[in-house]
């Protein structure tokens, strides 16, 4: 009897495997020769099935592999059966530039990429353009120019805490792992502005469960996207089998912690000394002033504001150290402009031409979000090609902004290309550069809401460090760019820098405030 049951089971299994093989073969033939996107070039595995995207997305090498594809196949490459990657400046405007969400040519977000769960969306994950528009409208006052002026002191306080640590530890033989310190800094800033609370990660020089979750969740994020693409119906089972108990526990604690921080922020109400992202909602007694909204938006803002800003500051530090002339010019501008580090703030750094050029060049050569932001075509022209309705398409930011056709010496770091024509360091060899090929924060109605905050934070931090210290890379073997991996977001490699105090530059005097280290 058992023998017969075993035979029956094997027979069923054989039939399932056979049908699976037939399905793969038949669908591959369709995708290769009859699919609406079959005319676009790309690797065989990418055109036939989703295997290429899945493999590259979890390998960490996505930006470099996509760059190689465009070098081989051209502006528009088929990276999946129903997915295209574009590396032309015009595609940025065509895909992301339509401001009217009701316009027939509006490209909607690709749900599978953005929506990780069935829970309500946030400013970063909501796919319905009307709901997203409402969320953005309610959050916008917290990111306005007026709000930034009130938030500047908060940002400076955390940056001064970093300077204090650098003045104490920067001269040691091993230097400081700035990938780690920049992440702690960005985390402290964004948590303070999201939940009105100082965690003091930089001040104590130690991480916590929350930031460790952010730093180590990249593979799970990448794997989650791959699973949703291919096995959406079985995603819970696959997640159960592949995600370990520690990761599940960290995620549960992360969500619980965010809700607790949201509850505490609600309890403090609008009568707080500092201005954060949710202050206006509390003052208005808005319906959005609730735990669900604060926790959902706050966790997205913390994740996005920590990873992208910190990794970019590490990359910019790396490129400046690799290009001593650029670092010298930056320091000369800063030390000529300021007599004391306390003069350096968000407003005073806006007019510094070389500083802002260096930041723009860093954004170009090492985009904070290098993956394409996938959209669903409504049936429209993109870069002169008709993209059928329902097709997935994105501009490959990392590729487009590093293309030799759009930027002279595109793989090299040259802030001079962003300088005004009358600047003494401007070089006419960059006069034909297409600046519109570099849009690190995207454009249109769904561009990054925190763009001005990010620029302000980077301006102040880089300025204070470059004004106060002379920099030295500790190890020539550390290649920050080569060693970086993309897993959901950039996973920064360790990068050690030694800092020597500049003569006459005094470190900031810290007023140690009460630090809340209870991470629920």
From Swiss-Prot:
Cofactor dependence is on: heme
Q: Where does heme bind?
A: 448
Location in the cell: Membrane
- EC class, as a word, reads oxidoreductase
The pathway it acts in is: Secondary metabolite biosynthesis; terpenoid biosynthesis
Cited CDD domains? CYP60B-like
Q: Which residues are glycosylated?
A: 177, 511
A GO cellular component annotation in the UniProt record: membrane
**InterPro entries xrefs:** Cyt_P450, Cyt_P450_CS, Cyt_P450_E_grp-I, Cyt_P450_sf, Cytochrome_P450_monoxygenase
Q: How does it sit in the membrane?
A: Single-pass membrane protein
Per the UniProt record, one Pfam family is: p450
| EC number(s) given by UniProt | 1.-.-.-
A GO molecular function annotation here is:
heme binding
Transmembrane parts of this sequence: 2-22
A single Gene Ontology biological process assigned to it is: terpenoid biosynthetic process
Protease in keyword set: no
Question: What domain of life does the native source organism fall in?
Answer: Eukaryota
User: What are the UniProt keywords, alphabetically?
Assistant: Glycoprotein, Heme, Iron, Membrane, Metal-binding, Monooxygenase, Oxidoreductase, Transmembrane, Transmembrane helix
Chain's role? Cytochrome P4590 monooxygenase part of the gene cluster that mediates the biosynthesis of betaestacins. The bifunctional terpene synthase btcA converts isopentenyl diphosphate (IPP) and dimethylallyl diphosphate (DMAPP) into the sesterterpene betaestacin I. The C-terminal prenyltransferase (PT) domain of btcA catalyzes formation of GFPP, whereas the N-terminal terpene cyclase (TC) domain catalyzes the cyclization of GFPP into betaestacin I.
Provide the family line. Belongs to the cytochrome P450 family.
The protein here is known as Cytochrome P450 monooxygenase btcC
Question: Which organism is this entry from?
Answer: Colletotrichum orbiculare (strain 104-T / ATCC 96160 / CBS 514.97 / LARS 414 / MAFF 240422) (Cucumber anthracnose fungus)
Q: What is the lineage of its organism?
A: Eukaryota, Fungi, Dikarya, Ascomycota, Pezizomycotina
Q: Gene for this protein?
A: btcC
